[in-house]
A protein has these predicted regions:
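Extracytoplasmic metal-acquisition and chelation regions
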Residues: 1-143
């Protein structure tokens, strides 16, 4: 297709692969101390992240992002937080923080905001890396 630029394409691909490998190593180091700890996410949007880095949420407050969780759902997750000694419940900036407060009230669980949209991140070539790094860093801070 474009043999004149083949060397540049291969170089760019190698650089991107090296950056991803480095990011994976960094994120694994960030997450290592909390691998066996229990956490709950606001909504079930992190399955690929969890699978890629060998972690697993104990549950999600909301089963989707289109509507607020019902009182029954909040009670169910709250019971799970208590029964499983969940240490962290993740909030998201675009959702009602009061819901997370209702889930953790009276428990020993901590909470922190995790931003899967990267709203406050600077657009540019490092956006994806920064987004993944921030997810890991903010999750680890919760413990």
């Amino acid at each position: 297709m474009d043999p004149d630029n083949a060397a540049k394409y291969f170089s760019n691909a190698k650089s991107a692969r090296d950056n991803v490998d480095s990011l994976v190593s960094e994120v694994n180091s960030i997450l290592d101390p909390m691998r066996d700890k229990k956490f709950v996410v606001f909504h079930d949007a992190y399955q690929y992240f969890e699978r890629a880095f060998g972690i697993s949420a104990s549950g999600a407050i909301s089963l989707g992002d289109a509507s607020d969780p019902s009182p029954a759902r909040i009670a169910e997750i709250r019971k799970r937080v208590v029964d499983e000694a969940v240490e962290c419940v993740l909030a998201e900036p675009q959702f009602n923080q009061g819901t997370v407060k209702a889930v953790i009230e009276g428990t020993k669980a901590n909470t922190t905001v995790i931003d899967p949209l990267g709203v406050k991140l600077e657009p540019g070539p490092s956006l994806y890396e920064n987004l993944i790094r921030n997810l890991a860093t903010n999750l680890a801070k919760c413990f």
